[in-house]
Amino acid sequence: MAKDPGRVLIFDTTLRDGEQSPGASLNLEEKLAIAQQLARLGVDIIEAGFPYASQGDFKAVQRIADQVGGEEGPIICGLARASKADIKACAEAIAPAPRKRIHTFIATSDIHLKHKLRKSRADVLKIVPEMVGYARSLASDVEFSCEDAARSDPDFMYEVIESAIAAGAGTINIPDTVGYITPAEFGDLIIGINKNVSNIDESILSVHGHNDLGLAVANFLEAVKNGARQLECTINGIGERAGNAALEELVMALHVRRRYFNPFFGKDSESPTPLTAIRTEEITKTSRLVSNLTGMVVQPNKAIVGANAFAHESGIHQDGVLKNPLTYEIVDAKTVGLAENRISLGKLSGRSAVRARLEELGYDLTREDLNDAFARFKDLADRKREISDRDLEAIVSEQVMQPEARFKLHLVQVSCGTALRPTATVTIADQDGIENTAVALGTGPVDAVCKALRSLTNEKNDLIEFSVKSVTEGIDALGEVTIRLRRDGKIFSGHSADTDVVVAAAQAYINALNRLVYSLKKSSLHPQHDVVKANL
């Protein structure tokens, strides 16, 4: 059997696989903010990125390793393809972290070998021990993944795994790269590895999975029952295509059903010892932070963190919950950090109260960023009686956590009505502070604003999504707008919140456009799609 640490290790890949979601691109400060919150959440390993992809990715991993990694903190991990250049860059990026890991991989399925890598099985059996050994010479903690393991020939994969462990891999990861496998099959796959890999007891077994068939979490739980002790997951389940296994769902399944899972760890079913090291009360704020910074909206009926996860419409359900929450709720909302504000913030609140609440929400702002956020808070407080946590989150993500600004919005003015053709006047400033103004007509005020902005910026793009939602309740609620732009097949998200949704739409468009322009400055490789040309 594989090594058993006595609990499940949570390997968070929000900053690597999660960021590969269309439109979820993050800048360095946003990645750092998420990494710091992941550390508060208690994840065991943070996969901070793919350092070889670009200089920007390298710097982000390096900064996280320096500022988030610690003797008592999470292991900081970087991804590397099975190539010396990738592995060397990864080792250099994670070097500042006291506890660090190199995660290298190569595909093992015949379809990937033939059509992507154009390599034989013999080639892979030669590359794996060489590259794992090289990684092991640079770091004491090495993880190896068999990409597309779910569609690989088991006997060949056993051979690859055995060679990786012999070369120094302390963790073996089994990815369901395309979300193909079913729970029973995944359990059998883990059983087969434990049974047929002679040196598996020298390594921890890990799993990674995508949600293309909606089975990722179920697959992982079956893998845990059969010996997997590391779960690679993301906050809110974000990731390529249909996403990854959701961290919050996995953790709470193991928490709520601990008595069921305990025997699979050799424990008494009544053992109160948690099966993960996650601080569950940090789940909600982590979910909201990731949603705000990526622009990836959490669906209302999403388990654990969706807006409706603890809502009851039926009268019968409401009556039962009022008498005893356990009648219809298997999770106490407070367990995942869903609680009312302890401090009521309004126009008389000072900087210290705002800073304290932001710190509780997971935001560690610089003095300059705090000044910007506080100025925005005071502006909003003049228009709203009370400021909620969601308002604060919207302020920070809009005002502070934004990409380098090439364009800044200075003026939005619209005229519309039953007898008027919607007209927008917009003024923006470029990075040199030069202002330009445009006027445009549209089918509505938002359409007119977007047309004016498009004419001012001269950046080609297609607006593929516009959505607006109320951040809080009441007539004075903030309206949060999300806009997605597409260019050359890539998607860029922008979001903003304001009591005036037209202003929010204009700022969201500018934010998306700044992300688009920022991305043009860096040319990033994709760890799976870009093939290593030579192992040099």
UniProtKB/Swiss-Prot annotation:
Question: Oxidoreductase among the record's keywords?
Answer: no
Positions contributing to Mn(2+) binding: D17, H208, H210, N244
Molecular functions per Gene Ontology = 2-isopropylmalate synthase activity; acetyl-CoA C-acetyltransferase activity; manganese ion binding
| Pathway in which the depicted protein is active | Amino-acid biosynthesis; L-leucine biosynthesis; L-leucine from 3-methyl-2-oxobutanoate: step 1/4
Q: Establish whether keyword Transferase is in the entry.
A: yes
Q: Where is this region: Regulatory domain?
A: 408-536
The subcellular localization recorded is: Cytoplasm
The protein's matches in Gene3D superfamilies, at most eight in alphabetical order, are given as: 1.10.238.260, 3.30.160.270, Aldolase class I
GO BP, sorted A to Z: L-leucine biosynthetic process
**Which Gene Ontology cellular-component terms appear in the entry?**
cytoplasm
Q: Which UniProt keywords apply?
A: Amino-acid biosynthesis, Branched-chain amino acid biosynthesis, Cytoplasm, Leucine biosynthesis, Manganese, Metal-binding, Transferase
PROSITE patterns for this protein = AIPM_HOMOCIT_SYNTH_1 (PS00815), AIPM_HOMOCIT_SYNTH_2 (PS00816), PYR_CT (PS50991)
SUPFAM superfamilies (alphabetical): 2-isopropylmalate synthase LeuA, allosteric (dimerisation) domain, Aldolase
Q: Which residues form the Pyruvate carboxyltransferase domain?
A: 8-273
Task: Give the matching Pfam families.
Answer: HCS_D2, HMGL-like, LeuA_dimer
Cofactors, names only? Mn(2+)
In the record, the note on similarity to other proteins reads:
Belongs to the alpha-IPM synthase/homocitrate synthase family. LeuA type 1 subfamily.
Subunit field text: Homodimer.
Functional summary from the UniProt entry: Catalyzes the condensation of the acetyl group of acetyl-CoA with 3-methyl-2-oxobutanoate (2-ketoisovalerate) to form 3-carboxy-3-hydroxy-4-methylpentanoate (2-isopropylmalate).
Please give the name of this protein.
Answer: 2-isopropylmalate synthase
The gene from which this protein is expressed is: leuA
